[in-house]
């Protein structure tokens, strides 16, 4: 048996082996070095060549997995194809998971909670205080961030591009008045919210800070532990009454103080998801999936309902995310995401590649592969190319020295899944020509990118 991180996808094996990957959509499974392989695709390819079995495991089902076992038009490629879905039975699943409640405005109004709008309403304070009588409580908070998102000034729905549904951002050049799409670069002139019809936007800064100081006033005298990238990782905490505040990926394990409590000594008595509203403004194609994955990972540390465990979602979020967590059925979100991607022509319903580098090099490549005025100018009824959009200069000094200009852009090319292999061949051929002919400027590409931004 070979167990490891991303690099283990290349480990030598013999015979019809089992190739299993955990959290196949995680950023850590995407190699950041040329040729940018994905662990999921590499392991599926190796399983096929070895006559073995490939298994993708995660708390939240990815859109790729949903498409492979339910999506119409699924195409068999070396790195994807038809698969069999595995989901736990309802009865044992209910016994193994906590009671999950969504305390949004409607639910708090139904409960006649007078603290509607508070970061931690009284209903949540009572539930968490009760849980603290018998053990630790985990509060999951968003990562601190300086990123900005645009939303409707009235209903707070995220502002998205009418052309490709990408997130809008303020232009880097403040002389421009119209926000631009981060995916296709189109200017959003005369924007109107599709939810309420409002015409104004507002800037939302996503992140959380000062949580421990704020909660100290709600839970007086209760010990608190903070685990985050900024504060440092806390690996485990004793199974005693305390509040543990952690960002996604930094949740400590519960360490039993004795063997008398059995499995209960390894569990949080309650888990609360704070600032759920930040999920409404998360960027990226897999933003909702990443949110659900992080929340499921945190809630999985909670005691099951048979031992009194409960989880609370505090604040507004996408109903599909909340329902998936409350039912512990990520197929709800995966199905919705897949339907939306079929409408907008996004992965995995199409094959796509990100191409970036100097503007003239990118545009020349797009023309040569047929994405500009050629046979790939359209993908179905949608444009075959998105962009180009300006991107930041490389962080490293060496990469900066390779740039003859600051005009660095990224574009996306989309083709039907049946032409995925041809897309890879054309991109490889044209980038090789660019290098061999010593044409100036950076030029790179990535097939099936995790994000389009």
Predicted feature residues:
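Loop/turn-to-beta-strand initiation segments
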Residues: 1, 15-18, 48-55, 136, ...
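Conserved RecA-like ASCE ATPase "motif II neighborhood" in helicase/translocase motors
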Residues: 2-18, 246-260
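SF2 helicase catalytic motif II
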Residues: 6-50, 54, 266-282
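Conserved helicase ATPase motor motifs in RecA-like P-loop NTPase domains
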Residues: 25-27, 32-73, 77-89, 143, ...
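Flexible beta-alpha connector loops of hexameric P-loop NTPases
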Residues: 26-37, 112-116, 200-204, 279-289
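Conserved interdomain linker/interface between the two RecA-like ATPase lobes of SF2 helicase motors
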Residues: 55, 59-153
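Accessory helical-bundle/CTD segments and flexible terminal tails appended to RecA-like ATPase motors
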Residues: 82-112, 219, 231-288, 297-453
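Cys/His-rich short segments
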Residues: 119-220
């Amino acid at each position: 048996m070979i167990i490891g991180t991303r690099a283990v996808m290349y480990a030598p094996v013999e015979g019809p082996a089992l190739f299993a990957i955990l959290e196949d959509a995680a950023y850590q499974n995407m190699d950041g070095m040329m040729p940018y392989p994905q662990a999921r695709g590499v392991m599926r390819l190796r399983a096929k060549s070895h006559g073995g079995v490939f298994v993708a495991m995660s708390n939240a089902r990815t859109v790729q997995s949903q498409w492979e076992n339910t999506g119409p038009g699924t195409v068999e490629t070396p790195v994807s194809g038809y698969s069999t879905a595995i989901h736990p039975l309802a009865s044992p699943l209910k016994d193994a998971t906590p009671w999950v409640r969504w305390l949004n405005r409607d639910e708090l109004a139904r409960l006649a909670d007078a603290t509607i709008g508070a970061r931690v309403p009284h209903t949540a304070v009572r539930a968490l205080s009760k849980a603290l009588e018998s053990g630790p409580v985990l509060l999951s908070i968003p990562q601190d961030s300086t990123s900005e998102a645009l939303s409707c000034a009235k209903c707070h729905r995220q502002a998205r591009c009418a052309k490709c549904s990408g997130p809008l951002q303020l232009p880097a050049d403040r002389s421009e008045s119209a926000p631009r799409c981060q995916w296709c670069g189109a200017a959003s002139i005369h924007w109107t919210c599709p939810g309420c019809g409002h015409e104004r936007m507002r800037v939302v800064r996503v992140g959380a800070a000062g949580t421990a100081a704020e909660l100290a006033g709600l839970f007086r005298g209760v010990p608190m532990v903070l685990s985050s990238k900024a504060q440092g990782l806390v690996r485990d905490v004793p199974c005693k009454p305390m509040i543990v505040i952690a960002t996604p990926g930094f949740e400590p394990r519960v360490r039993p103080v004795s063997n008398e409590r059995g499995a209960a000594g390894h569990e949080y008595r309650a888990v609360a998801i704070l600032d759920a509203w930040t999920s409404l403004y998360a960027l990226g194609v897999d933003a909702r999936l990443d949110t659900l994955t992080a929340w499921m990972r945190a809630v999985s540390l909670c005691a099951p309902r048979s031992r009194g465990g409960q989880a609370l979602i505090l604040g507004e979020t996408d109903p599909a995310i909340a329902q998936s967590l409350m039912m512990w059925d990520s197929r709800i979100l995966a199905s919705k995401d897949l339907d939306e991607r079929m409408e907008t022509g996004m992965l995995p319903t199409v094959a796509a590649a990100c191409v970036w580098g100097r503007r003239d090099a990118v545009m020349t490549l797009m023309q040569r592969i047929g994405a500009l005025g050629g046979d790939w100018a359209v993908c179905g009824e949608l444009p075959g190319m998105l962009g180009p959009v300006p991107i930041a200069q490389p962080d490293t000094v060496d990469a900066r020295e390779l740039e003859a200009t600051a005009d660095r852009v990224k574009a996306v090319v989309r083709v039907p899944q049946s032409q995925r292999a041809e897309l890879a061949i054309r991109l490889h051929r044209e980038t090789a020509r660019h290098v061999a002919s010593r044409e100036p400027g950076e030029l790179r590409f990535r097939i099936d990118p995790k994000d389009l931004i």
